Amino acid sequence: MTRRRLVEMCRMYSPGFMFLSETKKDKMYLQDLQVEVGFDNLQTVEPEGNSGGLALFYSNDFSVTFLLLDDRLIDIETIINGNRVFMTFIYGDPVVPNRDYIWERLMRIGVSRSEAWFIIGDFNEITGNHEKKGGKKRSESSFLPFRAMIQSCGLIDFPFQGNQFSWIGKRSNGKVRCRLDRAMGNEEWHNIFSHTNMEYLKMWGSDHRLLLSSILDRPKIFSRKFMFDKRWIGKPGLKEAVQEVGGWTVLMIIDQS
């Protein structure tokens, strides 16, 4: 995805957070990008050679405490609508044998998480053959570690719109599409932000779809008096106007692979 497209997406959705995985870029490049997309803050994990790298951009609307920061996940504590919450941003290991270690870490984190917890990103894994199209059918046992992590952490998927097959790749027998990207929350999150949802957007110069998640504690209902005009994009006060009407905060998750 080009920098220009990132800027356009941020102007369109005014997200409170933006997570980039597989950035392959150093901090100086990402700091320049931060200025272009208009975020107040940036936390990065440096890539190793020509692979890896994470970046979390966020606005001053959120007081963020970083709890864990490494090449696979960023774990934070923040306040949303007066509620203390936890948020984890994931980039699952593309190497299958290495994924179990990530699931174990998440389960250790989940044991002590009774407060609202939101987790989102590219997990590089699916829960079953129903989340893939094309390629060879996988054995049911291969999905068990990921499912066990989800169950152990008490995570529940959010409703979504759009095409759930968020990644497309090529294999010897043709194209493969999988739902590698998702957002989930524990029971407490669903209790507080009961109308949280996500949307799979278009693929823009990437093999992953953009994933947009809206955090809502009530239905997003726009009155007939509120008419959105694209000419407002980028204008001062747009984000505040939308939040006042819908009461929501948006996270945009973009994979740079």
Outline where the language-model segments fall.
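A shared catalytic/ligand-binding motif for oxyanion handling
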Residues: M1-S257
